[in-house]
Amino acid sequence: MRSRSSTRIPVPLMLIIRIALTLSCIRLTSSLDGRPLAAAGIVVTGDKAVDIYTSSQTGSIIVKLLPNMPKDKEACAKAPLEAYNRTLTTLLTPLGDSIRRIQESVTTSGGRRQRRFIGAIIGSVALGVATPAQITAASALIQANQNAANILRLKESIAATNEAVHEVTDGLSQLAVAVGKMQQFVNDQFNNTAQQLDCIKITQQVGVELNLYLTELTTVFGPQITSPALTPLTIQALYNLAGGNMDYLLTKLGVGNNQLSSLIGSGLITGNPILYDSQTQILGIQITSPSVGNLNNMRATYLETLSVSTTKGFASALVPKVVTQVGSVIEELDTSYCMETDLDLYCTRIVTFPMSPGIYSCLSGNTSACMYSKTEGALTTPYMALKGSVIANCKMTTCRCADPPGIISQNYGEAVSLIDRHSCNVLSLDGITLRLSGEFDATYQKNISILDSQVIVTGNLDISTELGNVNNSISNALNKLEESNSKLDKLNVKLTSTSALITYIVLTVISLVFGVLSLVLACYLMYKQKAQQKTLLWLGNNTLDQMRATTKI
């Protein structure tokens, strides 16, 4: 059988072409235009990039807590180092014991292993209650057991080195970096200097620095007395332990400098202690860092609402707090799966909800389609700063301008006032003085009024009031009904008795019978009359014919 030539495009190339065609059909994302919405009490406060992440990258940082002194200065630093060593052991022994109990719980197989595992967790938690997060942390600790054992196998060489930071790769299944914040101090102060220091000064310097580091360790592990092995360490705590050397590990894990500051603020970089050795004062921490994917065509837009003035009172716009826009599609974004930073939104999944046509039209700039709720009270903050200018409801608060002096009044029916440096340089609101530097250009809509049909009831108190009005209307209707019943009761009861009703029915039937008979009789008489008319007409015609015949003769 002859083979046919194939013209199929390879799968990777097909995917690239499909992606390119898809992107070419999607218009580049532009943030929501807040200029037509500001005067309606809807303020766009900012945008954030939307990223997808998964916590898949792990590495280990080995903290060398006890520094190695130069040989010629060991005697001078012996006393503070011994005191520091004893304090370290006292502080971190509960942590090491907790880690060992959990890791040793996997030595038994089957159901007994599961019971020992849960028992070890509960034994490490105050009040005997283990949360799901603590059980997850314990599972991660079990998985890192082999890596911790490999690190302990190298503990002597790690403790003996004078390097402040170096990679440890011998026999380890994941990236590990040994760091020593105190070793860095010793290297900077004593190893790399030609200055001669007396023994007393060396003792003082080492003692002060060790005490400061102990304070940081107490700050890191102090809140973990109840469950020291199951509480994740924050990125701030990790930096306290490792100093600036922490950046080396994060860079090795693939965290770029452009993402580092944002990820630090997100709290997604965490660490869990996996080992502590009191002999060499080695502390092992497993670092979890997210793997981040950028969604270049998506951003989150944050919206805030002001209490605006309407003819029905104060009200606020019914719009989502966060929306996302891709091309011409605008949908509400659920941020419950996301971690926020100043510039980014890191999400494990993207969940959006479609908006009603009215809200979509409202956010697109058609303020007459916006709906408002009478749920804002008089104590709600009636102003908001936006790019050096102020949007304020000057009917709820006094907008006092100090430069030039005067009171800014809000026109009747106007929802809010847009105040910039052209109308006031220094503005006072509720005792707060603001110097304005921004401006609302001609693209901002002003003097927007909210119609009565745009204000609806959504608050519990307002709904209760409306229900009260409905109840009053029902009560009035019941009163009218009772009044009607009382008037009916005054009528003659005999007229409405059963015998009277029977009499009425009989008379009605008789009347109908007489009516039918009369109709039949009338029809008969009309028929008879027409028959007589036909007879007379026939006789008349015959007589006329006879007379015509006689005349001809």
Swiss-Prot record:
Membrane topology reported for the UniProt record: Single-pass type I membrane protein; Single-pass membrane protein
Disulfide bonds: C76-C199, C338-C347, C362-C370, C394-C399, C401-C424
Ranges in a coiled coil: 142-170, 466-491
Site (Cleavage): R116, F117
Post-translational modification: The inactive precursor F0 is glycosylated and proteolytically cleaved into F1 and F2 to be functionally active. The cleavage is mediated by cellular proteases during the transport and maturation of the polypeptide.
Lipid-bearing positions (S-palmitoyl cysteine): C523
Extracellular-side positions: 32-500
Assigned keywords, A-Z: Cleavage on pair of basic residues, Coiled coil, Disulfide bond, Fusion of virus membrane with host cell membrane, Fusion of virus membrane with host membrane, Glycoprotein, Host cell membrane, Host membrane, Lipoprotein, Membrane, Palmitate, Signal, Transmembrane, Transmembrane helix, Viral envelope protein, Viral penetration into host cytoplasm, Virion, Virus entry into host cell
Region of interest: Fusion peptide: 117-141
Name of the featured protein: Fusion glycoprotein F0
Species whose genome carries this gene: Newcastle disease virus (strain Italien/45)
